[in-house]
Design a protein with these regions (language model features):
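A glycine-rich, often tryptophan-bearing local segment used as a flexible ligand/cofactor-contacting loop or short
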Residues: 93-213
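C-terminal segment of classical bacterial N-terminal signal peptides
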Residues: 16-21
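Non-transmembrane alpha-helical segments in soluble domains
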Residues: 52, 106, 217, 292-295
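N-terminal export leaders
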Residues: 4-8
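Helical hinge/lid and interdomain linker segments adjacent to catalytic or ligand-binding clefts
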Residues: 31, 36, 40-134
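Alpha-helical assembly-interface signal, strongest on the long, hydrophobic N-terminal helix that forms
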Residues: 12-14
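Catalytic beta-strand/loop cores that center a nucleophilic Ser/Cys/Thr
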Residues: 56, 62-64, 82, 158-265
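Extracellular ligand-binding/catalytic regions of CAZymes and related secreted enzymes
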Residues: 25-27, 67, 109, 238-243, ...
Length: 302
């Protein structure tokens, strides 16, 4: 029989114990997918839903899948207000996304409200283009803010969705003109966010983990192979990444910076290259694990 004295002792002990901590809130993840019909060749329920389903099965993640055809293009305030990490896939309908939607995403990244993961062909998504343009503007402004001489900066946006040729000058780039009165005029050509070579042949690619201690590379092999991918070839017209986590190569000699991170204000952007929507890349364990790692790292308090 439990005596009154024992019960009082338990109550007294409990009074000195720290209160139980509230359970950690799950990371709010939004998977945005254009859902082009050709995805059905590899994903019976679309690529975005494949990724969302995997992430939803992992502890500590709350996942919402949205599409371009949803209300507000799947990017309304009701979605973004409840998002910590936005994963973005598009390919054939880049131009249908409203630019003000892309700029709102960038504003939220800069403020630290959200982070973004752009996958494969989303190198030409408007949110990624706008994010890379803003990285370029920020770096350029910071570099010349303390210059003794007067510097005038003109940012030049190229034509959307027109890829560079092999001999095109790499963007972003700066053309400077100095005047006798001490002024310097800079013309800054914003990044094209594309590359001169690609091949949709479904051949293997060979990836190397360049930063094995990076949180995105946690539990990822030093080297691994994807059995069927689309090839992208450098040079990738992007601002210099703050970190390159993975490099990808093909037997034809092509190579690509396939896992790039940029700091943008108080937020971050991660670009992960492997794809094509007709190849089951995102049924492979390693790419899914990389996305999960990226979600957890991008959402971590800084």
């Amino acid at each position: 029989m439990v005596t009154r004295r024992i019960l009082l002792g338990i109550a007294t002990l409990a009074a000195f114990l720290p209160p139980a901590s509230a359970p950690a809130q799950p990371i709010q993840v939004v998977m945005w997918d254009e859902q082009q019909p050709s995805q059905k060749q590899a994903y019976s329920n679309f690529l975005g839903n494949e990724i969302a389903g995997y992430l939803a099965s992992r502890p500590g993640l709350a996942v919402r899948a949205v599409t371009l055809d949803d209300a507000g293009q799947g990017l309304g305030s009701d979605v973004l207000d409840n998002c910590q990490v936005l994963i973005y896939w598009d390919h054939a309908r880049h131009h249908e996304v409203k630019r003000d939607k892309a700029r709102e995403i960038v504003r939220r990244i800069k403020s630290g409200q959200i982070a973004m993961i752009s996958l494969h062909s989303a190198h030409w998504s408007l949110p990624f283009i706008e994010a890379m343009a803003e990285v370029t503007r920020t770096r350029t402004t910071q570099r010349y803010a303390s210059a003794d001489q007067q510097v005038e900066i003109n940012f030049v946006q190229g034509q959307d969705f027109v890829g560079p040729k092999r001999d095109s000058q790499i963007t972003p780039r700066v053309a400077a003109r100095k005047f006798p009165d001490g002024r310097t005029a800079l013309k800054v050509y914003l990044p094209n966010c594309a590359f001169p070579g690609w091949r949709e042949d479904g051949k293997p690619s060979y990836l190397t983990t360049l930063l094995p201690n990076h949180p995105i590379a946690r539990d990822i092999p030093a080297r691994f192979t994807l059995p069927a991918t689309e090839m992208y070839d450098e040079p990738f017209h992007i601002p210099r990444p703050d970190e390159v986590v993975f490099e990808e190569r093909w037997t034809g000699g092509e190579w690509f910076r396939s896992g790039c991170v940029w700091q943008l204000g108080r937020g971050r952007v991660f670009y992960f290259r492997p794809g094509h929507e007709t190849f089951p890349v995102y049924k492979e364990k390693i790419p899914l694990k990389i996305i999960e790692n990226a979600v957890r790292w991008l959402a971590a308090p800084r």
